[in-house]
């Protein structure tokens, strides 16, 4: 879900209180996260690690049911695979997706991947990255020399809220069910995918 401006401002104000940060940190620790994993969640907001194995272990044990359509802008290397005429796609890394179609359009546009290709799919189980990343930001302790930590925290929470990101584990298998054209500023190709299973 997308958080309101008032909710994010409330998170920011409360996160200025050390006791609130400590309470949220304890909540994450009680859910099985360690401090390094909490930092990894924050790192993933802007840049996923090259090695997804650690991230994959984090999300596999925290999947929740999902019945909503997901959207993903397709990067160039995946577009090349699609051009080979395949029917089955197995993701060998953790896959990010959004509940917001416009986020996928942005990533597929010339502003990011410049592929004009999007996936539309459902995954029965997802990791709610948005929820945990917001919590990780709310409990983050910044270096004392870091300037404007609360503004930085707020901007990152805005980004996480806007992207409405979830993740699915590496080894997720989908079948290409359909393909159609979609026009918005430019013409996009949207592939609809049916979930086949987890090859974990």
From Swiss-Prot:
Phenotype when changing residue 109 to A: Complete loss of enzymatic activity in vitro
* Signal sequence bounds: none
The entry's function note states: ADP-ribosyltransferase that efficiently ADP-ribosylates both alpha subunits of host RNA polymerase RPOA. The ModA-induced ADP-ribosylation of RPOA alpha subunits inhibits transcription from viral early promoters.
Q: What is its main location?
A: virion
User: What effect on the protein does mutating residue 129 to A have, as reported in its record?
Assistant: Complete loss of enzymatic activity in vitro
- Belongs to which family? Belongs to the Tevenvirinae NAD--protein ADP-ribosyltransferase modA family.
**Which reaction is the catalytic activity of this chain?**
L-arginyl-[protein] + NAD(+) = N(omega)-(ADP-D-ribosyl)-L-arginyl-[protein] + nicotinamide + H(+)
- Annotated organism of origin: Enterobacteria phage T4 (Bacteriophage T4)
Keywords on this record? Answer: Glycosyltransferase, Transferase, Virion
The record lists the effect of residue 127 to A as: Complete loss of enzymatic activity in vitro
GO MF annotation terms? NAD+-protein mono-ADP-ribosyltransferase activity; NAD+-protein-arginine ADP-ribosyltransferase activity
UniProt: NAD(+) binding residues: 72
Q: What is its EC number?
A: 2.4.2.31
User: Where does this protein reside within or beyond the cell?
Assistant: Virion
UniProt superkingdom: Viruses
Catalytic residues of the enzyme: 165
Q: Does the keyword Glycosyltransferase apply?
A: yes
- The protein's name is NAD--protein ADP-ribosyltransferase modA
This protein's GO cellular component annotations are: virion component
């Amino acid at each position: 879900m997308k958080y309101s401006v008032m909710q994010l401002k409330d998170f920011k104000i409360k996160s200025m209180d050390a006791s609130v940060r400590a309470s949220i940190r304890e909540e994450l620790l009680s859910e099985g996260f360690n401090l390094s994993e909490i930092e990894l969640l924050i790192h993933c907001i802007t840049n996923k690690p090259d090695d997804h194995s650690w991230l994959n272990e984090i999300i596999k044990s925290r999947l929740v049911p999902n019945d909503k359509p997901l959207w993903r802008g397709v990067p160039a290397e995946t577009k090349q695979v699609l051009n080979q005429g395949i029917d089955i796609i197995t993701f060998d890394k953790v896959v990010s997706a959004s509940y917001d179609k416009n986020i996928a359009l942005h990533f597929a546009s010339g502003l990011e991947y410049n592929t004009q290709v999007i996936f539309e799919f459902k995954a029965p189980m997802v990791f709610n990255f948005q929820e945990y990343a917001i919590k990780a930001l709310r409990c983050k302790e910044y270096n004392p020399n870091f300037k404007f930590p609360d503004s930085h925290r707020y901007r990152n929470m805005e980004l996480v809220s806007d992207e409405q990101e979830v993740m699915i584990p590496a080894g997720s298998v989908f079948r290409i069910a359909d393909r159609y054209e979609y026009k918005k500023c430019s013409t996009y190709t949207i592939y609809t995918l049916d979930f086949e299973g987890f090859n974990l």
